[in-house]
Amino acid sequence: DYSANNKWMNELHLNMNADINDKTKFYGRLSMAKNWSQMGWSGTPYDLDAGRNTRSSGPVLYVDRAYLDYYITPEWIATVGRQPGTDGPGSNLRNNALRQSTYPALAINALGDAAVITYKPESLQDHKVAIRAAYGKTYQWDEEGKVRDWMSDQKDADANLYYAAVEGELPIEGMGDNLIIFNVAHMTDFALPLPGINLPIGPSGALVNVLQDGVYNLGNLTLANIHFENYNAFGTNFNYFVSLGYSNGTNAHTLSAIPAVQSQLEFNEKDGYAVHVGGRYDFTKTLKVGYEFFWGSRYWYTMSRPSINDPLNIRMTRGTAHDFYVIYQLDRYQFLRLSYTNIQNIWGNRGLPFGGAKKDKARADNIMLMYNVKF
Protein backbone atom coordinates (compact mmCIF):
# COMPACT_ATOMS: atom_id res chain seq x y z
CA ASP A 1 0.00 0.00 0.00
CA TYR A 2 1.12 3.56 -0.62
CA SER A 3 -0.27 7.06 -0.90
CA ALA A 4 0.79 10.05 -2.98
CA ASN A 5 -0.57 13.32 -1.66
CA ASN A 6 -0.47 17.00 -2.59
CA LYS A 7 0.23 16.44 -6.29
CA TRP A 8 -0.30 19.38 -8.66
CA MET A 9 -0.67 19.32 -12.45
CA ASN A 10 -1.39 21.61 -15.38
CA GLU A 11 -2.93 20.78 -18.75
CA LEU A 12 -3.07 23.14 -21.73
CA HIS A 13 -5.16 22.83 -24.90
CA LEU A 14 -4.53 25.21 -27.79
CA ASN A 15 -7.47 24.70 -30.14
CA MET A 16 -7.39 25.72 -33.79
CA ASN A 17 -9.87 25.79 -36.65
CA ALA A 18 -10.01 27.32 -40.11
CA ASP A 19 -12.64 27.50 -42.83
CA ILE A 20 -10.30 27.08 -45.80
CA ASN A 21 -13.16 27.35 -48.28
CA ASP A 22 -16.78 26.24 -48.63
CA LYS A 23 -15.75 22.59 -48.89
CA THR A 24 -12.69 22.30 -46.66
CA LYS A 25 -12.33 22.86 -42.92
CA PHE A 26 -9.35 22.31 -40.62
CA TYR A 27 -9.42 21.49 -36.91
CA GLY A 28 -6.46 21.05 -34.60
CA ARG A 29 -5.31 20.95 -31.00
CA LEU A 30 -1.87 21.24 -29.44
CA SER A 31 -1.68 19.93 -25.88
CA MET A 32 0.60 19.72 -22.90
CA ALA A 33 0.09 17.97 -19.55
CA LYS A 34 2.74 18.19 -16.85
CA ASN A 35 3.35 17.98 -13.14
CA TRP A 36 4.43 21.18 -11.44
CA SER A 37 8.23 21.45 -11.71
CA GLN A 38 8.26 17.98 -13.23
CA MET A 39 11.41 15.88 -12.97
CA GLY A 40 12.32 12.61 -14.64
CA TRP A 41 11.00 13.36 -18.13
CA SER A 42 13.13 11.45 -20.66
CA GLY A 43 12.82 13.85 -23.60
CA THR A 44 11.59 11.17 -25.98
CA PRO A 45 8.02 10.25 -26.95
CA TYR A 46 6.70 6.80 -26.23
CA ASP A 47 7.39 4.16 -28.85
CA LEU A 48 3.69 3.67 -29.53
CA ASP A 49 2.16 7.06 -30.28
CA ALA A 50 -1.43 5.90 -29.80
CA GLY A 51 -0.54 4.83 -26.27
CA ARG A 52 0.93 8.15 -25.15
CA ASN A 53 0.12 8.67 -21.50
CA THR A 54 -1.28 12.20 -21.54
CA ARG A 55 -1.41 12.41 -17.77
CA SER A 56 2.07 13.83 -18.24
CA SER A 57 3.66 14.71 -21.57
CA GLY A 58 6.39 16.73 -19.95
CA PRO A 59 7.02 20.40 -20.77
CA VAL A 60 6.49 19.95 -24.53
CA LEU A 61 3.55 20.47 -26.85
CA TYR A 62 2.29 17.48 -28.81
CA VAL A 63 -0.33 17.15 -31.53
CA ASP A 64 -3.54 15.97 -29.90
CA ARG A 65 -5.63 16.32 -33.07
CA ALA A 66 -5.14 17.77 -36.56
CA TYR A 67 -7.56 16.83 -39.32
CA LEU A 68 -9.31 18.10 -42.43
CA ASP A 69 -13.00 17.76 -43.26
CA TYR A 70 -13.69 17.84 -47.01
CA TYR A 71 -17.36 18.12 -48.01
CA ILE A 72 -17.60 16.07 -51.20
CA THR A 73 -21.32 16.84 -51.18
CA PRO A 74 -23.53 18.10 -48.35
CA GLU A 75 -24.19 14.43 -47.49
CA TRP A 76 -20.70 12.95 -47.94
CA ILE A 77 -17.72 14.15 -45.87
CA ALA A 78 -14.16 12.85 -46.03
CA THR A 79 -11.91 13.32 -42.99
CA VAL A 80 -8.18 12.67 -42.85
CA GLY A 81 -5.50 13.27 -40.20
CA ARG A 82 -5.05 12.94 -36.46
CA GLN A 83 -8.54 12.13 -35.24
CA PRO A 84 -10.56 13.69 -32.41
CA GLY A 85 -10.20 10.44 -30.50
CA THR A 86 -10.13 11.53 -26.85
CA ASP A 87 -12.78 12.70 -24.36
CA GLY A 88 -15.65 11.33 -26.46
CA PRO A 89 -19.28 10.59 -25.54
CA GLY A 90 -19.33 9.10 -22.08
CA SER A 91 -17.02 11.75 -20.65
CA ASN A 92 -19.08 14.87 -21.44
CA LEU A 93 -21.05 15.04 -18.19
CA ARG A 94 -18.05 14.74 -15.89
CA ASN A 95 -16.02 17.14 -18.04
CA ASN A 96 -18.91 19.64 -18.09
CA ALA A 97 -18.55 19.91 -21.86
CA LEU A 98 -20.35 19.42 -25.13
CA ARG A 99 -19.35 16.52 -27.39
CA GLN A 100 -15.57 16.59 -27.82
CA SER A 101 -14.94 13.54 -30.03
CA THR A 102 -16.42 11.43 -32.81
CA TYR A 103 -15.81 8.17 -30.96
CA PRO A 104 -17.43 6.92 -27.72
CA ALA A 105 -14.86 6.92 -24.93
CA LEU A 106 -15.53 3.28 -24.02
CA ALA A 107 -14.51 2.19 -27.54
CA ILE A 108 -11.70 4.59 -28.46
CA ASN A 109 -10.09 7.03 -26.05
CA ALA A 110 -6.59 7.39 -27.48
CA LEU A 111 -4.55 9.37 -29.98
CA GLY A 112 -4.63 8.04 -33.53
CA ASP A 113 -4.50 8.85 -37.23
CA ALA A 114 -7.10 7.73 -39.78
CA ALA A 115 -9.06 8.40 -42.95
CA VAL A 116 -12.84 8.53 -42.45
CA ILE A 117 -15.82 8.73 -44.77
CA THR A 118 -19.13 9.97 -43.29
CA TYR A 119 -22.56 9.78 -44.88
CA LYS A 120 -25.32 12.01 -43.49
CA PRO A 121 -28.50 11.23 -45.47
CA GLU A 122 -30.48 14.41 -45.98
CA SER A 123 -33.78 12.55 -45.55
CA LEU A 124 -32.77 11.55 -42.00
CA GLN A 125 -31.26 14.79 -40.75
CA ASP A 126 -34.23 15.40 -38.48
CA HIS A 127 -32.82 12.43 -36.55
CA LYS A 128 -29.15 13.50 -36.97
CA VAL A 129 -28.20 10.19 -38.58
CA ALA A 130 -24.54 9.70 -39.55
CA ILE A 131 -22.89 6.55 -40.94
CA ARG A 132 -19.10 6.27 -40.71
CA ALA A 133 -16.34 3.99 -41.94
CA ALA A 134 -12.68 4.53 -41.09
CA TYR A 135 -9.24 3.07 -41.67
CA GLY A 136 -6.28 3.92 -39.47
CA LYS A 137 -2.87 2.89 -38.21
CA THR A 138 -2.10 2.32 -34.55
CA TYR A 139 1.48 1.22 -35.25
CA GLN A 140 3.62 1.94 -38.31
CA TRP A 141 7.28 1.01 -38.50
CA ASP A 142 9.65 3.97 -38.19
CA GLU A 143 12.89 2.85 -36.57
CA GLU A 144 14.68 6.20 -36.56
CA GLY A 145 11.79 8.63 -36.82
CA LYS A 146 12.58 9.47 -40.44
CA VAL A 147 10.31 9.36 -43.46
CA ARG A 148 12.75 7.13 -45.33
CA ASP A 149 12.02 4.36 -42.84
CA TRP A 150 8.69 3.85 -44.60
CA MET A 151 10.75 1.90 -47.15
CA SER A 152 12.98 -0.02 -44.73
CA ASP A 153 12.74 -3.68 -43.79
CA GLN A 154 10.77 -4.57 -40.68
CA LYS A 155 10.27 -7.62 -38.53
CA ASP A 156 6.53 -7.53 -37.86
CA ALA A 157 3.53 -6.16 -39.74
CA ASP A 158 1.96 -2.75 -39.18
CA ALA A 159 -1.17 -2.69 -37.05
CA ASN A 160 -4.31 -1.74 -38.99
CA LEU A 161 -7.54 -0.41 -37.51
CA TYR A 162 -10.95 -0.68 -39.20
CA TYR A 163 -13.94 1.14 -37.71
CA ALA A 164 -17.64 1.46 -38.55
CA ALA A 165 -20.43 3.31 -36.76
CA VAL A 166 -24.03 4.42 -37.07
CA GLU A 167 -25.36 7.20 -34.88
CA GLY A 168 -28.50 9.24 -34.54
CA GLU A 169 -31.16 10.65 -32.24
CA LEU A 170 -34.09 8.58 -30.97
CA PRO A 171 -37.40 10.13 -32.12
CA ILE A 172 -39.09 9.91 -28.72
CA GLU A 173 -41.28 12.93 -28.05
CA GLY A 174 -40.29 14.93 -24.99
CA MET A 175 -37.13 12.92 -24.28
CA GLY A 176 -34.82 15.85 -24.92
CA ASP A 177 -31.46 15.92 -26.65
CA ASN A 178 -30.12 12.40 -27.02
CA LEU A 179 -27.53 10.41 -28.95
CA ILE A 180 -27.27 6.70 -29.71
CA ILE A 181 -24.19 5.14 -31.33
CA PHE A 182 -23.61 1.59 -32.56
CA ASN A 183 -19.94 1.06 -33.39
CA VAL A 184 -17.37 -1.67 -33.95
CA ALA A 185 -13.58 -1.56 -34.31
CA HIS A 186 -11.30 -4.34 -35.54
CA MET A 187 -7.52 -4.22 -35.26
CA THR A 188 -5.25 -6.64 -37.10
CA ASP A 189 -1.69 -7.35 -35.96
CA PHE A 190 -2.13 -5.53 -32.65
CA ALA A 191 1.38 -4.29 -31.87
CA LEU A 192 3.11 -3.19 -28.67
CA PRO A 193 6.74 -2.37 -27.82
CA LEU A 194 8.13 -5.00 -25.44
CA PRO A 195 11.40 -4.94 -23.45
CA GLY A 196 14.02 -7.65 -23.91
CA ILE A 197 13.98 -10.66 -21.57
CA ASN A 198 17.08 -12.52 -20.30
CA LEU A 199 16.75 -15.82 -18.42
CA PRO A 200 19.29 -18.19 -16.81
CA ILE A 201 19.56 -21.30 -19.00
CA GLY A 202 21.32 -24.63 -18.35
CA PRO A 203 23.41 -25.91 -15.42
CA SER A 204 25.70 -22.89 -15.48
CA GLY A 205 22.80 -20.47 -15.14
CA ALA A 206 24.20 -18.27 -17.91
CA LEU A 207 21.82 -15.51 -18.99
CA VAL A 208 20.40 -16.03 -22.46
CA ASN A 209 18.32 -13.49 -24.37
CA VAL A 210 14.95 -15.15 -25.03
CA LEU A 211 13.17 -12.03 -26.29
CA GLN A 212 14.79 -9.05 -27.98
CA ASP A 213 13.71 -5.44 -27.51
CA GLY A 214 11.23 -4.41 -30.18
CA VAL A 215 7.67 -4.05 -31.37
CA TYR A 216 5.77 -7.33 -31.62
CA ASN A 217 2.48 -8.35 -33.20
CA LEU A 218 0.35 -9.96 -30.50
CA GLY A 219 -2.88 -10.86 -32.34
CA ASN A 220 -6.15 -9.36 -33.55
CA LEU A 221 -8.59 -7.34 -31.42
CA THR A 222 -12.29 -6.66 -31.93
CA LEU A 223 -14.26 -4.07 -29.94
CA ALA A 224 -18.00 -3.42 -30.09
CA ASN A 225 -19.89 -0.69 -28.27
CA ILE A 226 -23.42 0.64 -27.85
CA HIS A 227 -23.62 4.10 -26.33
CA PHE A 228 -26.66 6.18 -25.38
CA GLU A 229 -26.84 9.57 -23.69
CA ASN A 230 -29.72 11.89 -22.84
CA TYR A 231 -29.61 15.53 -21.73
CA ASN A 232 -32.38 17.25 -19.74
CA ALA A 233 -34.31 14.01 -19.85
CA PHE A 234 -38.04 14.57 -20.37
CA GLY A 235 -37.82 18.23 -19.42
CA THR A 236 -35.95 17.69 -16.15
CA ASN A 237 -32.47 18.75 -15.04
CA PHE A 238 -31.25 15.14 -15.12
CA ASN A 239 -28.63 14.00 -17.64
CA TYR A 240 -27.35 10.45 -18.05
CA PHE A 241 -25.53 7.97 -20.29
CA VAL A 242 -25.26 4.19 -20.67
CA SER A 243 -22.37 2.54 -22.52
CA LEU A 244 -21.91 -1.20 -23.11
CA GLY A 245 -18.66 -2.71 -24.35
CA TYR A 246 -17.46 -6.05 -25.77
CA SER A 247 -13.88 -7.07 -26.57
CA ASN A 248 -12.40 -10.22 -28.11
CA GLY A 249 -8.86 -11.28 -28.95
CA THR A 250 -8.02 -13.76 -31.72
CA ASN A 251 -5.07 -15.11 -33.72
CA ALA A 252 -2.57 -14.98 -30.85
CA HIS A 253 1.04 -14.96 -32.06
CA THR A 254 3.81 -17.09 -30.57
CA LEU A 255 6.56 -14.72 -29.43
CA SER A 256 8.92 -17.08 -27.63
CA ALA A 257 9.83 -20.78 -27.70
CA ILE A 258 10.26 -20.67 -23.91
CA PRO A 259 6.89 -21.71 -22.36
CA ALA A 260 7.36 -19.58 -19.23
CA VAL A 261 7.97 -16.48 -21.36
CA GLN A 262 5.20 -17.23 -23.85
CA SER A 263 2.63 -17.65 -21.06
CA GLN A 264 3.41 -14.12 -19.82
CA LEU A 265 3.09 -12.59 -23.30
CA GLU A 266 0.25 -14.65 -24.78
CA PHE A 267 -2.49 -12.50 -26.31
CA ASN A 268 -5.80 -13.06 -24.50
CA GLU A 269 -8.10 -14.96 -26.88
CA LYS A 270 -11.02 -14.32 -24.56
CA ASP A 271 -14.28 -12.38 -24.44
CA GLY A 272 -14.44 -9.23 -22.34
CA TYR A 273 -17.44 -7.16 -21.27
CA ALA A 274 -17.95 -3.74 -19.71
CA VAL A 275 -20.77 -1.51 -18.48
CA HIS A 276 -20.34 2.22 -17.87
CA VAL A 277 -23.28 4.30 -16.63
CA GLY A 278 -23.42 7.81 -15.26
CA GLY A 279 -25.84 10.52 -14.29
CA ARG A 280 -25.66 14.20 -13.36
CA TYR A 281 -28.33 16.39 -11.83
CA ASP A 282 -28.05 20.12 -12.39
CA PHE A 283 -29.61 21.69 -9.29
CA THR A 284 -28.93 25.15 -10.71
CA LYS A 285 -26.79 26.52 -13.53
CA THR A 286 -24.09 26.84 -10.89
CA LEU A 287 -24.28 23.55 -8.93
CA LYS A 288 -24.13 20.12 -10.59
CA VAL A 289 -23.73 16.73 -8.86
CA GLY A 290 -22.86 13.49 -10.64
CA TYR A 291 -22.08 9.81 -10.16
CA GLU A 292 -20.60 7.14 -12.46
CA PHE A 293 -20.35 3.37 -12.15
CA PHE A 294 -18.10 1.07 -14.17
CA TRP A 295 -17.81 -2.70 -14.31
CA GLY A 296 -15.28 -4.62 -16.38
CA SER A 297 -15.03 -8.40 -16.70
CA ARG A 298 -11.96 -10.61 -16.20
CA TYR A 299 -10.51 -10.14 -19.70
CA TRP A 300 -11.92 -6.70 -20.50
CA TYR A 301 -9.68 -4.50 -22.64
CA THR A 302 -10.28 -1.38 -24.72
CA MET A 303 -8.33 1.39 -26.45
CA SER A 304 -8.22 3.82 -23.54
CA ARG A 305 -5.44 5.71 -21.80
CA PRO A 306 -5.21 7.84 -18.65
CA SER A 307 -5.66 11.60 -18.76
CA ILE A 308 -5.57 14.51 -16.36
CA ASN A 309 -9.36 14.12 -16.00
CA ASP A 310 -9.08 10.36 -15.42
CA PRO A 311 -5.63 9.54 -13.99
CA LEU A 312 -6.72 6.04 -12.89
CA ASN A 313 -8.08 5.15 -16.36
CA ILE A 314 -11.44 4.00 -15.03
CA ARG A 315 -12.43 2.38 -18.36
CA MET A 316 -9.67 -0.24 -18.00
CA THR A 317 -11.02 -1.53 -14.69
CA ARG A 318 -11.35 -5.30 -14.27
CA GLY A 319 -13.79 -5.16 -11.41
CA THR A 320 -15.87 -2.20 -10.26
CA ALA A 321 -15.34 1.54 -10.07
CA HIS A 322 -17.38 4.34 -8.48
CA ASP A 323 -16.91 8.04 -9.14
CA PHE A 324 -18.65 10.90 -7.32
CA TYR A 325 -18.21 14.53 -8.32
CA VAL A 326 -19.54 18.03 -7.69
CA ILE A 327 -19.20 20.82 -10.26
CA TYR A 328 -19.42 24.47 -9.26
CA GLN A 329 -19.78 26.82 -12.23
CA LEU A 330 -18.00 30.08 -11.45
CA ASP A 331 -19.18 31.75 -14.65
CA ARG A 332 -19.71 30.90 -18.31
CA TYR A 333 -16.02 30.21 -18.89
CA GLN A 334 -14.76 28.46 -15.76
CA PHE A 335 -15.72 25.87 -13.18
CA LEU A 336 -14.41 23.83 -10.25
CA ARG A 337 -14.85 20.06 -9.95
CA LEU A 338 -14.27 18.08 -6.76
CA SER A 339 -14.25 14.31 -7.32
CA TYR A 340 -13.70 11.05 -5.46
CA THR A 341 -12.92 7.85 -7.40
CA ASN A 342 -12.77 4.33 -5.97
CA ILE A 343 -11.60 1.37 -8.08
CA GLN A 344 -11.67 -2.27 -6.97
CA ASN A 345 -9.78 -4.52 -9.40
CA ILE A 346 -10.46 -8.22 -8.81
CA TRP A 347 -8.47 -9.47 -11.84
CA GLY A 348 -4.83 -8.74 -12.62
CA ASN A 349 -3.08 -7.25 -15.66
CA ARG A 350 -5.66 -4.49 -16.11
CA GLY A 351 -4.86 -2.36 -19.13
CA LEU A 352 -2.98 -5.21 -20.85
CA PRO A 353 -4.38 -7.37 -23.67
CA PHE A 354 -1.94 -10.21 -22.91
CA GLY A 355 -0.62 -12.28 -20.01
CA GLY A 356 -3.92 -13.65 -18.73
CA ALA A 357 -5.87 -12.32 -15.74
CA LYS A 358 -5.27 -14.04 -12.43
CA LYS A 359 -7.40 -13.40 -9.37
CA ASP A 360 -6.31 -10.16 -7.72
CA LYS A 361 -7.38 -7.68 -5.09
CA ALA A 362 -6.18 -4.16 -5.80
CA ARG A 363 -7.85 -0.97 -4.62
CA ALA A 364 -7.20 2.58 -5.77
CA ASP A 365 -8.71 5.80 -4.39
CA ASN A 366 -8.31 9.29 -5.76
CA ILE A 367 -9.55 12.66 -4.49
CA MET A 368 -9.00 15.50 -6.92
CA LEU A 369 -9.90 19.16 -7.30
CA MET A 370 -9.94 20.48 -10.87
CA TYR A 371 -10.07 24.11 -12.01
CA ASN A 372 -11.08 24.39 -15.67
CA VAL A 373 -11.06 27.52 -17.84
CA LYS A 374 -12.24 27.70 -21.46
CA PHE A 375 -11.92 30.81 -23.56
Can you annotate each of these PLM segments?
Residues 29-32, 81-84, 134-136, 294, ...:
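Active-site-proximal beta-strand/loop segments in catalytic clefts of secreted hydrolases
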Residues 1-79, 110, 115, 119-125, ...:
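Beta-barrel outer-membrane channel/assembly domains of diderm bacteria
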Residues 22, 71-75, 118-129, 168-179, ...:
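Secondary-structure boundary elements
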Residues 39-65, 74-169, 198-212, 303-314:
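Surface-exposed coil loops of outer-membrane beta-barrel proteins
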Residues 34, 74, 84-86, 123, ...:
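Short loop/turn segments at secondary-structure transitions that flank enzyme active sites
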Residues 10, 64, 111-113, 160-162, ...:
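Residues that flank catalytic or metal-binding motifs in active/ligand-binding sites
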Residues 52-55, 176-375:
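Outer-membrane beta-barrel pore domains
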